Amino acid sequence: MTDEAGKPSTNRDRGQINRRHFLAGTGALAWSLTVVKPELLRGTQANSRIALGMIGCGVRGTWIADLFVKHGGYEVVAAADYFQDRVDAFGEKFRVDSARRYTGLSGYRKLLDGKVDAVVIEGPPYFHPEHAAAGVDAGAHVFLAKPIAVDVPGCRSVEASGRQASAKKLCFLVDFQTRTDPLYREAVKRVQNGDIGRIICGEATYITGEGFGRQVSDLRADPTNPERRLRAWGLDRALSGDVITEQNIHAVDVATWILDAQPVHAYGDGGRGARTLGDCWDHFSVIYTFPGDVLVTFCSKQLGEGWDDILCRMYGVEGTVDTHYSEDVSIRGKTPFAGGKATNLYANGAVRNIADFYNNITAGRFANETVPPSVRSNLTTILGRTAAYHHRDVTWDEMMKADERLVPKLEGLKA
């Protein structure tokens, strides 16, 4: 399932995020606040906290803002969300001055007109490229939620914003939790060093129950109301990118990370087996062909109950790497790696990314290495989605040349 914060979750890990579990899971992580170089922060003095503007104040935005505050090196000073109730609830929780709470589709621009050192972007994915580009243009460091975009033009935009950020000596970090995990990192390093031999094929799955329960209720109340549709963005194909991009990207990202490649082409299918609201599908099946004729089968569903898992496996001539979002990460074969269990990955990964963002800003590191692989994984989901929608084989080059743009229905929403 997916909780209202966008957390990828299964029956095994529902309800795990609470204060006690979070503190226990992250107690080994400690940060010492370094002296902040004055030139890296605008309108602040050395040793002061990084001034954050939050764009997107829903459940996930509020949750991750709390992690930024707990880090100790940040202060939330401004907030923007389309909805007044959300930005006010957020502002009260984090003591954001009422004059620095902005609403409407263009509220983020007013936020950036003020003095913020960095922006955290947690709104519907359709808006991510626009918000990220505006942040970089305004001279702010950018912390961007996945997925980075819903379509090819959006991915190109974020890729360009990442390059522009580096040129302007700004940090730009994409918040994929899996890539921060020590077990995942060690397993991927071993595979790329040849521990399972030549990879022949693989599989990636995202099998969960139905999510977005609150959004379903919102949309069911009045499906034609534009503000209801915006609140229920996870059920809207253009606002979310559909489940293969918005949710399933967690599994796809691990596959592209292990193979360190983009697919050549893909064949797919899927549909709506249970959903009755919105226009997103609830299941996808895709066969990706990567360089060297490596075949990776992908399957996802967000419906029903029963067995569920978020995993990626790669099969080599000398072994198998097996990774699970909430379970075992290991290698079996001639050169085994016992690995272990990826613990509380959703929270711990975000905490590590928040720490990395702070350390990169304060140390003046602007390589922004998370952007290119995030673009690659996002485009890989779009390739699978395109192939599934058209029920045929689609090449990477064909997808990029088509440059298809998703356009949501924003009529009736306030600017």
List the model feature ranges, each with a label:
Residues P8-A30:
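N-terminal secretory signal peptides and thylakoid transit peptides that target proteins
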Residues G25, L29-F94, A255:
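N-terminal Rossmann-like dinucleotide-binding module
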Residues G56, A167-L173, T178-G278, V286-Y288, ...:
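Predominantly a Rossmann-like dinucleotide-binding segment in NAD(P)-dependent oxidoreductases
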